[in-house]
């Protein structure tokens, strides 16, 4: 019987046998409270196939609503949830709990090189300023083409 069918029949859904308690250690920063950042640890229940983003949601929704982080598509497309997880730049929505050694605290901090606004949120404007300055696209000198511009091996 599926979990949905069991729930509809009045039975409790089956409990996962792989759930574990993981410690998420987050570098917190709130300029309205202090100029210094500090580490805070939270314990959440997680499955090995949960994503770090799921753990952050549990912290925010169940333990500390003041935690601030960006997320959007949750499918690894937009890059909104880029952060340092266990010392590496990663997307929280693509990083599985089982891949970051959940037997030890999972450290989460903002990405480096950009000013931190609050907790895991950084000011992206310096990045976008640099992006606009290099114009990472082709600019034509004439009229728009009427068909696709094909590139030969010699043109590359």
How should each PLM-predicted stretch be described?
Residues 2-156:
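Signature of N-terminal electron-transfer/Fe-S-associated modules in redox systems
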């Amino acid at each position: 019987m599926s979990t949905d069918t069991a729930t509809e029949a009045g039975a409790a859904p089956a409990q996962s046998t792989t759930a574990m308690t993981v410690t998420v250690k987050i570098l917190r920063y709130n300029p309205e409270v202090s100029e210094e950042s500090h580490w805070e640890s939270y314990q959440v229940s997680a499955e090995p196939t949960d994503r770090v983003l799921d753990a952050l949601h549990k912290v925010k929704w169940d333990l500390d609503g003041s935690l601030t982080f960006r997320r959007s598509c949750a499918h690894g497309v937009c890059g909104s949830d880029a952060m340092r997880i266990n010392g590496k730049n990663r997307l929280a929505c693509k990083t599985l709990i089982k891949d970051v050694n959940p037997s030890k605290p999972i450290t989460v901090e903002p990405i480096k090189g950009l000013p931190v606004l609050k907790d895991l949120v950084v000011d992206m404007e310096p990045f976008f300023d640099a992006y606009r300055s290099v114009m990472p696209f082709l600019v034509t000198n004439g009229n728009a083409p009427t068909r696709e511009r094909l590139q030969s091996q010699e043109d590359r």
